[in-house]
């Protein structure tokens, strides 16, 4: 298996919607820290959280998350 990393555009979508991390977290039922750690790439969200974010922003999950080759 290749080395890959999950990249995301959560911060971009959140900024476009003028939401704080706390606002977004509350809207999808997670903690602000969860949103923060997803945005900086320290936490890989569960499928459920990824789908909740996509549903909230009304975009396909692939517009928020993508795989990038490492190395």
Where are these regions (language model features)?
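A short, Lys/Arg-rich alpha-helix, primarily the initiator
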Residues: 1-16
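Alpha-helical residues within the helix-turn-helix
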Residues: 15, 26, 55
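Short alpha-helical DNA-recognition segment
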Residues: 18-36
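Key DNA-contact positions within bacterial/archaeal DNA-binding proteins
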Residues: 33, 43, 62
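DNA major-groove recognition helix of helix-turn-helix/homeodomain DNA-binding modules
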Residues: 48-63
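Short amphipathic recognition helices of helix-turn-helix/homeodomain-type DNA-binding modules
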Residues: 63-71
